[in-house]
Amino acid sequence: MQRLSESKKLRGDGWQEKNMRQRLADYVADFLVKKGITDCFMVVGGGAMHLNDALGHKEGLHCTYNHHEQACAMAAEAYARVNNRIAAVCVTTGPGGTNALTGVLGGWLDSIPMLVVSGQVRYDTTARYMQQFTNGLPIRAVGDQ
């Protein structure tokens, strides 16, 4: 005998899509593919681990892994110039995002499209979150750096 949940999955009426939980990272990967993005240039990092996982496993999305974020942005710019299509860039938190800026600026100056996605640390490990516990004293850093 089938369980109710199994029979609903088999019905084909979209029940599964409407009632299943989905990670935000998987939603981002789905969004990119639905918008026609087929290539992503990325550097893996702890702050973007869920994005790395989702993008790397997404069918229809080809990921090219680089050793530096600047290379990712420059590769996305070159990809757009050669293929006349937008590419995505995925980098990790903090310096990962700022390292990509030179390549992003190069694309921006020539109106070359690219979509840059960066990871983010948990909010409860940030200095902004911790200020509520210090009577307003500014904190430079806490937790993840």
Please identify what each model-predicted range represents.
Residues 14-145:
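N-terminal alpha/beta PP-like core and its mobile active-site loop of ThDP/TPP-dependent enzymes
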